[in-house]
Design a protein with these regions (language model features):
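Short, surface-exposed coil-to-beta transition loops
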Residues: 3-5, 65-70, 91-96
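Beta-strand elements of well-folded, non-transmembrane domains
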Residues: 10-12, 58-62, 75, 89, ...
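A short, structured loop/turn motif at beta-sheet edges
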Residues: 13-15, 45, 74-79, 98-107
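Glycine-rich portal/gate segments that line the openings of hydrophobic small-molecule binding cavities
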Residues: 39-86
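Beta-strand/loop substructures that line and gate deep hydrophobic ligand-binding cavities in soluble
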Residues: 84-129
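A conserved amphipathic terminal alpha-helix motif
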Residues: 114-152
Length: 152
């Protein structure tokens, strides 16, 4: 098993970050173009709550099919999220997200434990780049929203 851990300071209060974490559109925005997540059951809205499980068509770089990715939520509160995830190619993708309030900003940590047999090292290398990318997109999104809020 290999672990990726990435921490950044986000330019928004923890409640704002937690609110955005609850939206599938946030995941879809921050993951692109490294990955795309399309709900299997598009007729049902995605609602992440403790105990919920949801499945997505997962594509690497938006076009390479990489199986059905399942997310099971074990914890979901203002301090963060813990999910057990995986797919046919990566059976273990355990992902705590830790949110720490630091005034008008939030310390945000992604930690991912990965197990994919012989593919683990390659998936781990991709995941290091993916989580650095995700956090940069988070920061860009929050800055743009803050700019829009201040303009109005």
């Amino acid at each position: 098993m290999k672990t990726v851990r990435k921490t950044s300071v986000f330019p928004a209060k923890r409640d704002v970050v937690f609110s955005k974490l609850q939206e599938l559109s946030t995941l879809q925005y921050i993951a692109a173009p490294y990955a795309t997540f399309t709900p299997i059951d598009s007729a049902q809205p995605v609602v992440w709550t403790v105990g919920s499980t949801s499945s997505y068509r997962f594509r690497l770089f938006g076009f390479l099919p990489f199986g059905t990715h399942t997310i099971h939520i074990e914890r979901f509160d203002r301090d963060g999220i813990r999910s057990k995830e995986g797919n046919e190619h990566v059976p273990v993708w355990n992902h705590p997200i830790i949110l720490r309030d630091i005034g008008d900003q939030t310390e945000y940590t992604d930690q991912v434990d990965i197990e994919a047999g012989l593919k683990t090292v390659f998936i781990w290398l991709w995941a290091k780049a993916f989580y650095a990318h995700r956090q940069k997109k988070w920061i860009r999104m929050l800055k743009e929203q803050n700019h829009e809020y201040n303009r109005n």
